[in-house]
From Swiss-Prot:
Residue ranges annotated for the KH-like domain, each copy included: 354-438
A Gene Ontology biological process term: ribosome biogenesis
Family note: Belongs to the TRAFAC class TrmE-Era-EngA-EngB-Septin-like GTPase superfamily. EngA (Der) GTPase family.
Descriptive protein name: GTPase Der
Subunit structure comment from the entry: Associates with the 50S ribosomal subunit.
Lineage, uppermost ranks: Bacteria, Pseudomonadati, Pseudomonadota, Betaproteobacteria, Burkholderiales
Pfam assignment, any one: KH_dom-like
CDD domains reported for this sequence: EngA1, EngA2
Record GO terms (molecular function): ATP hydrolysis activity; GTP binding; ribosome binding
InterPro entries, A to Z: AAA+_ATPase, G_ENGA, GTP-bd, GTPase_Der, KH_dom-like, KH_dom-like_a/b, P-loop_NTPase, Small_GTP-bd
Source species of the chain: Burkholderia pseudomallei (strain K96243)
Record-linked SUPFAM superfamilies: P-loop containing nucleoside triphosphate hydrolases (SSF52540)
PANTHER family on file: GTPASE DER (PTHR43834:SF6)
Annotated ranges, domain EngA-type G: 3-167, 180-353
Length: 445
């Protein structure tokens, strides 16, 4: 699973600036979830082939007793507990503050790897910047400028060396033997643990821990109708005897890690509750990660027909961006609708891994353009010449041509729908990339 880097420090030391630098964005992938302060954000970064999650915590007051500072401190502690590496940021311009000492005292007790980072060090000699902070007892300070990027790459590379050390690497053969990896995600109390137990059956549980990170990752292998699957622990499912029960402390980090690690995600919703912003944020992260998706609307049994219609309308309105996914109305407790749900899991995975031959893609592209040409932008009309597959899981279709910057988002969605229909790409996000070039085979017989 992707390691977690937590950014910790008192207010105004540059945590958000470093967050934006590491994630190469000005916003979080998942933000403002209910129960979280607006100052705690989650994003994704990558160095080469090493992806990671980064948590931007609020300003930390370790001894805050009540109010918003207490809540921010509680959430920061949770972020530290879930982190593989903690980056403790201090302010090189203003020097050592009493609050820095309190935070350092707390962090030393956690047992987490700590990287002491002195920010705002641009234009200053290292000895002058670092000297004050040795007394924190956290080793050699690393001087950076989050605003300008100085020293950031070296720092994050060192942090990832620590975070990935001891991470168990699974062979391709072992991964294939596991079958489809499924993450079941959703808010607390939507029925995740009930669905897990319905899927695996009490007498077929094979659970084991994979040590090597600060959080043991629980995988559950099971077989259904002769097919092998692996369930990934999602946000607090823990085994008690032969049954899995939900620990109702919603963990954003675990949810994001599980989604990233999965082949297919089952987003579980509660038919008896309104669709929340949190549901939409989780769904958005699944799409952003390019994961195949099936939506299960649980607790459907016994609902009044009028309530069912209202729920369907609510789903269509609030989750319109999931039109590519299959929705199933199920009861995990009564074990109804589960077979169809799992068939959609198989179909979504098959779609995500489908191979799309270049001749067929190009033919589909030409037919789409003949049916509806892209609009001109001023005097320029885009010319779409040929297409090939650029990747799987999710499928990536690369379109070559001229003046492709003029292709509108509306036309891009039109092409996506045409490709989905032609190649039966239900249940998976689809990426379309445009590259201005010429077809090397255009003038050849």
């Amino acid at each position: 699973m992707k390691p977690v880097i937590a950014l910790v420090g008192r207010p105004n030391v540059g945590k958000s600036t470093l967050f934006n630098r590491l994630t190469r964005s000005r916003d979080a992938l998942v933000a403002d979830l209910p129960g979280l302060t607006r100052d705690r954000h989650y994003g994704e970064g990558r160095v080469g082939a090493r992806p990671y999650l980064v948590v931007d915590t609020g300003g930390f007051e370790p001894v805050a007793k009540d109010g918003i500072l207490h809540e921010m401190a509680r959430q920061t502690r949770q972020a530290v507990e879930e982190a593989d590496v903690v980056v403790f940021i201090v302010d090189g311009r203003n020097g050592l503050a009493p609050q820095d000492k309190s935070i350092a005292d707390y962090l030393r007790k956690t047992g987490r790897p700590i990287f002491l980072v002195v920010n705002k060090a641009e234009g200053m000699k290292y000895t002058a910047v670092a000297s004050d902070f040795y007394e924190l007892g956290l080793g050699d300070p690393r001087a950076i400028s989050a605003a300008h990027g100085d020293g950031v790459n070296d720092m994050i590379n060192e942090a990832l060396e620590v975070a990935y050390a001891g991470e168990p690497q699974e062979s391709e053969e072992a991964a294939a033997a596991r079958g489809i990896k499924i993450a079941i995600v959703g808010r607390p109390n939507v029925g995740k643990s009930t669905l897990v137990n319905t899927l695996i059956g009490e007498d077929r549980v094979i659970a084991f821990d994979m040590p090597g990170t600060t959080r043991d990752s629980i995988y559950v292998d099971f077989e259904r109708n002769g097919k092998h699957y692996t369930l990934i622990d999602t946000a607090g499912l823990r085994r008690r005897g032969k049954v899995f029960e939900a620990i109702e402390k919603f963990s954003v980090v675990k949810t994001l890690q599980s989604i990233s690690d999965a082949n297919v995600v089952i987003l579980l919703l509660d038919a008896r509750q309104d669709i929340s912003d949190q549901d939409a944020h989780i769904a958005g992260f699944v799409v952003e990660q390019g994961r195949a998706l099936v939506v299960g609307v649980n607790k459907w049994d016994g609902l009044d027909p009028h309530v069912r219609e209202r729920t369907k309308a609510d789903l269509a309105r609030k989750l319109k961006f999931l039109e590519f996914a299959k929705f199933h109305f199920i009861s995990a407790a009564e074990k109804t609708g589960i077979g169809a749900l799992m068939r959609s899991v198989d179909d979504a995975y098959a779609a995500a891994m489908k191979k799309l031959p270049t001749p067929k893609l190009t033919r589909a592209l030409i037919e789409a353009v003949e049916f509806q040409q892209p609009r001109r932008r001023g005097p320029v009309r885009p010319k779409l010449r040929y297409a090939h597959q650029g990747g799987q899981n999710p499928p990536i279709i690369v379109i070559h041509g001229n003046a492709l910057d003029a292709v509108t988002e509306t036309y891009k969605r039109y092409l996506e729908n045409r490709f989905r229909e032609t190649f039966s790409l239900t249940g998976t996000p689809l990426r379309i990339e445009f590259r201005s070039s010429t077809n090397p085979y255009a003038d050849k017989d």
